[in-house]
Amino acid sequence: MVQSIERGIEILKLLEAGPLGVTELANATALPKTTVHRLLKTFEAHHWVEFNRARKYQLSWGVLPMAKSFLTSLDVRAIAQPYMVAIRDQLQQSVNLFLAQGDYRICIERVAADKPLRHDIKIGTVYPIFKGAAGKIFGTYLGDLNDTDMSASECSQIRHDGYVVTRGNRVPDAASMAVPIFSFGNKLEAVMTISGPIGDYTEERVKEYLSVMMTLGQTISKQMGATL
């Protein structure tokens, strides 16, 4: 019984990469074709796989309820928080996590650095959704250009670069960097920012900050189910 389950799991994992035929699956698993075919027919009965027009098997809609159950249990705040601490400790910048709520964005998590700023952000602080570095990310992925002060070329550049840096945008003596956090289906889930004194955001330091933010932002996204 256990061996059959292990064989079935192996076949499903192979199908994650795309459709495969019985012979291809048999070769990849070193299983007899009859065994592979029997397992596929069992999966097909549960709508976990389907036989497509190219005469190959692919994952089907039956796997979605299982995935959805897992994905709905994911808490971006809980997943991001330890990485936010790591970013704060490495870069000595305050780290913030924002969610979109209608016409606003709200800070749902913050890890503060020992660099107090005027108008410092607190958990629960609400801002207009399209303002600031985080707002530009939300505007790029969620906004109608008619509702933002962003151009189509700016949005295109942000999608290409994967980050935003602003200096003195919301607070005159502060600067910020924002990166998107994606979830299942590569849907924008949240925006993570760092913020600090504007003097910290020299060209050299921005490169250092960007390397860390992009790497850990993508790590959080992958744990949220994104396929980047």
Model-derived features with residue positions:
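N-terminal helix-turn-helix
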Residues: 1-74, 218, 222, 226
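Amphipathic alpha-helical effector-binding/dimerization core
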Residues: 58-146
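Juxtadomain coupling helices with adjacent low-complexity linkers
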Residues: 90, 145-161, 172-173, 190-228
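Sensor-regulatory modules in signal-transduction proteins
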Residues: 181-184
